[in-house]
Regions:
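N-terminal hydrophobic signal/anchor transmembrane helix of membrane proteins
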Residues: 14-15, 130
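Positively charged n-region of N-terminal signal peptides that target proteins for export
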Residues: 1-11
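C-terminal motif of bacterial Sec signal peptides marking the signal peptidase cleavage site
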Residues: 16-20
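Exported/periplasmic ABC-transporter solute-binding proteins
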Residues: 4, 22-287
Length: 287
């Protein structure tokens, strides 16, 4: 009889355990955790545009790929104008521009989202005696009204102006801040930020302009103060440094981004990216 009771109790316990297991699963017997499975991203994200944004998109892309190993972020440094066009015609998921989207571009269906701010540093050769210029002096130098360094406190020598090509976001930002649109007289018009820095570094009488993020750490050129104000993250953010511009992601209003491109966009425009943007020498704006 004891054996019979023991067997019955064992059967009851087994049924109870099975019932408990069934209650924690779905109707088809599969377990449900209650948590949505994490989506694994894959595919490519194509970025195209501003050469000045190279450091910023470089660190953002590297971090995003480290966090999402199935995704490849590519960057084609073509300049702001070409990047905006690439976003418009679908050759890029996200266009990169170092100027704001113009009214006519917005009217065509493009949307600009500011990722960061960047100071445009006015640079001279590292050996130059000139350390400070006003916005007015800078404008007069680039429009040809001031032609010799002795006119602004430097050693005598004919000033050589180095700038970017038409369509460059850096050039657009520089000219709009110095009120020199279509008036600059360049000795050299170059197609990348790096080329401008290299040209100024190689000519003791040269002056140029370049992204703050590209100039930091360079000992072959120096950034002059503008009206006594240094070009830095703090002075760009508080507005006291006058020559600055935005770093912008350009997308199409009527086109949905791929899952991986949208995830990259969301990451780059969030506070999670602030330290990376700052480390790249730009000023984050996400709050």
């Amino acid at each position: 009889m004891k054996k019979g009771i023991t067997l019955i109790l064992s059967l009851v316990m087994a049924v109870t355990l099975l019932a408990g297991c069934g209650a924690s699963g779905s109707e088809d017997g599969s377990a449900e955790s209650g948590d949505t499975a994490e989506v694994q991203l894959s595919g490519a994200v194509a970025l195209n545009g501003s050469t000045s944004m190279e450091k910023v998109v470089g660190v953002l892309g590297e971090q995003f790929m480290a966090d999402n190993q199935g995704v490849s972020v590519t960057y084609d440094a073509t300049g702001s104008g070409a990047g905006i066009e690439a976003a418009s015609n679908g050759r890029a998921d996200i266009g990169l521009s170092s100027r704001a989207v113009k009214d006519e571009e917005a009217a065509s269906g493009l949307v600009g989202t500011t990722v960061a701010l960047d100071g445009i540093a006015v640079i001279v050769n590292a050996e130059s005696a000139v350390a400070d210029l006003t916005v007015e002096q800078i404008a007069k130098i680039f429009t040809g009204e001031i032609t010799d360094w002795s006119e602004v406190g430097g050693a005598a020598g004919t000033i050589s102006c180095v700038g970017r090509e038409a369509g460059s976001g850096t050039r657009d930002g520089f000219e709009s801040n110095t009120d020199t649109e279509d008036a600059c007289k360049m000795d050299q018009e170059l197609t990348s930020t790096g080329a401008v820095i290299e040209a100024v570094a190689g000519n003791p009488n040269a002056i140029g302009y370049a992204s703050l993020s590209s100039v930091e750490g360079k000992d072959t050129v120096k950034a002059v103060t503008v009206g006594g104000v240094e070009c830095s993250e703090a002075t760009v953010l508080d507005g006291s440094y006058e020559i600055q511009r935005p770093f912008v992601f350009v997308t199409k209003a009527d086109a949905e981004l791929s899952a991986q491109a949208q995830a990259f966009f969301d990451f780059a425009t969030s506070t999670a990216a602030n330290d990376l943007i700052r480390a790249a020498g730009a000023v984050p704006v996400a709050k």
